Amino acid sequence: MQRSAGILLPISSLPSPYGIGCFSQEAYDFVDWLKEAGQTYCQILPLGVTSYGDSPYQSFSAFAGNPYFISLDALVEEGVLTAAECKKANFGRKADDIDYSRLYTERGRLLRLAYSRSDIGHNEAFTAFCEKNKWWLDDFALFMAVKDRFEGKPWIEWAEDIRLRWQPAMDYYRRELYFEVEYHKYLQFKFDEQWRKLKAYANSKGIQIIGDIPIYVALDSADAWANPGLFQLDKDNIPTAVAGVPPDGFSPTGQLWGNPLYRWEAHRATGYQWWITRLWYCFELYDVVRIDHFRGFDEYFSIPYGSETAVDGHWEKGPGIELFRAVEQALGKREIIAEDLGYMSETVRQLVRDSGFPGMKVLEFAFDSRDTGSASDYLPHNYPVNSVAYTGTHDNETLVSWYQTISDAERAMVRDYLYDYATPDEQLYKSMIALILRSAAATCIIPMQDWLGLDNAARINKPSTVGQNWRWRLKKTQLTKKLQKEICQLTTRYGRKNWA
């Protein structure tokens, strides 16, 4: 990665009149805004179909896209919806919030209406899409249709015949739920069509997309249902152990994620084909891919299934560099960012070095005594060129609120490091942004909320909590020319401007 800069903003957080950010005109406008701000990258969160809890890191599929992101305006232009129908829908009254319960009802109703008016049976592009993607699409669409039939229950609670994918049951549900299966294929077709168009536009403006994928798939996913042999499941397809992380300064009982763990010996036996295919598909969608929880490839935390916390977990060895050598042999060199935050053993550090991928540096961790990593690694003067620097990520407090909540001693450390005792507290975030922009890190990614100087009301996610996460949205009025000019000036000053 060349010396550059970018902004972190989930698609869901874009402005939109339809309850959630999507592939609408506002997304294209944001691309234009980024270009004028001198940026090279737009980093987003995973684009997968979200489930209960609304986390993009717990998706029903590692390959399917979120129908919430389909532009309704584009469907109006196609003639399968009317502007009046879209305007009549109630997506909630707050322009800076996502009301997922209303979204589920209203968008679902409109998308089904669009499907009922579409002529996909005679659409050659739809047929070609289904044929090209049948290797994941057939299982996913059937999974979603059967899930609806079983009133949304996780697949491990379905009837035994379809839970274990007995052929007579598979054939029966494909016939019985044919139109429902086609509906889910239609949604994926529209998602793919609209996303590729938006990405092509971004690339034409010199903006590259940094995508994000979780290392694990969700237990309640088409991936686990269709490929039980690749995961640590018993003969009844029930997990024997699940993923998480041990206790640390942020979470005294650790984090119990609940994802099924990989059966790495099964992946090794196939030459890691599932992972090669997954990453190949990611690079069809993104220019750069950030892999969350990269340390899990060196060693992963295994928690007995049924545990209420992560305290009884233990570390086990992962595939290590062998996996990424197989990926490189199959796909060539690709741009991957290794999320290597938190406590890193020497073997994890060695894996990151051996891979050649840039790791991540988060400014907030440099001054926060709760962090279990080495704080000095996160001080900007120590950032290596082969790294991506952030003020914070989607899991962190906004820079403004973080500075307010750390201790007096930690705030003094920040002031001393900046050698700035005059700037008012409420404006100090700008000095901290400038601090990482002038570091040696090849790329700097700043969350949009930090450029805006927003507090935790704009925080994306607080790990180990549910209810108020993944909801913040940007208001269109916040994308001002003044802010754009300020970002461009700082980006240019520190040699990061995109001149494309």
Regions found by a protein language model. Name each.
Residues K35, W195-N203, E328, V352-R353:
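Surface-exposed amphipathic alpha-helices with a cationic face
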Residues Q25-T50, L285-Y286:
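Catalytic domains of carbohydrate-active enzymes, especially glycoside hydrolases
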Residues H184, Q188-V217:
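Conserved, well-ordered alpha-helix/loop/beta-strand core segments that scaffold catalytic motifs
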Residues E36, I162, A169, W472, ...:
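Domain-scale activation on soluble regions of proteins
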Residues P10, S16, D54-D192, V217-I445, ...:
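Alpha-amylase-like alpha-glycosidases and glucanotransferases acting on alpha-linked glucans and related
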Residues M1-S12, Y28:
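N-terminal regions that are enriched for targeting/export leaders
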Residues L45, Q208-I210, P214, V288, ...:
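Outer-envelope exported proteins of Gram-negative bacteria
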